[in-house]
């Protein structure tokens, strides 16, 4: 169904993150007829891939990266470029009619023992939203938030200091 029609009462499961894990669980829940909403902080499904460094490709073969129900096309490269993965994720959401809210930040949640539901606080395109799902699944990935721990002596280093999350291309150094 369309996201616009989804209400807090309708939401059985709230999935945080529209990457490979979040979309996979949403697809499985849909096949089980369990209402599910996926929220993604990026502006588009697949942006978690699109926004990474220019030369990124999957580090293992296409055949071990399939999502449930619809496999990557066999004619695609063995090691998929990031933009192909990103586009596939968007297609996957449309093909399986998954409910996804993009530009949505998960702020916090607390469990209400009395009702047996969560109280989830979201900000969707700048607007606060409150949902009451029965379950919340965190599918935020392993590298969603860069670790910028202090490094002793870093302030004395004369070269360029850059976190890998900020690297997009070698062009400035070529």
Whereabouts are the PLM-identified features?
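Glycine-rich dinucleotide-binding loop and its adjacent helix/turn
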Residues: 1-6, 67, 75, 81-84, ...
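Phosphate-coordination loops involved in phosphoryl transfer and adenosine-cofactor binding
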Residues: 10-12, 103, 174
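N-terminal Rossmann-like FAD-binding beta1-loop-alpha1 element of flavoenzymes
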Residues: 10-38
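Active-site acidic short loop of glycosyltransferases
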Residues: 11, 132-134, 159
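Short glycine-/acidic-enriched loop or helix-start segments at secondary-structure transitions
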Residues: 25, 48, 147-149
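Helix N-cap at the beta1-alpha1 junction of Rossmann-like dinucleotide-binding domains, i.e.
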Residues: 43-45
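Glycine-rich active-site loop/strand segments that organize a redox cofactor
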Residues: 47-87
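Feature captures the FAD/FMN-dependent oxidoreductase FAD-binding
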Residues: 79-145
């Amino acid at each position: 169904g369309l996201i616009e029609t989804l209400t807090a009462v309708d939401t059985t499961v709230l999935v945080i993150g529209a990457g490979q894990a979040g979309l996979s669980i949403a697809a499985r829940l849909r096949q089980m007829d369990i209402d599910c909403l996926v929220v993604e902080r990026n502006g588009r499904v697949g942006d978690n891939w699109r926004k990474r460094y220019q030369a990124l490709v999957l580090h293992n073969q296409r055949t071990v990266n399939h999502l449930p129900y619809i496999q990557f096309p066999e004619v695609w490269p063995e090691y998929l470029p990031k933009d192909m993965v990103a586009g596939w994720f968007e297609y996957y959401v449309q093909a399986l009619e998954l409910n996804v809210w993009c530009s949505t930040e998960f702020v916090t949640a607390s469990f209400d023992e009395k009702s047996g539901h969560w109280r989830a606080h979201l900000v969707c395109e700048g607007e606060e939203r409150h949902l009451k799902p029965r379950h919340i699944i965190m599918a935020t990935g392993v590298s969603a938030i860069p670790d910028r721990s202090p490094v002793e002596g870093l302030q004395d280093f004369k070269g360029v200091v850059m976190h890998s999350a900020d690297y997009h291309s070698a062009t400035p150094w070529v």
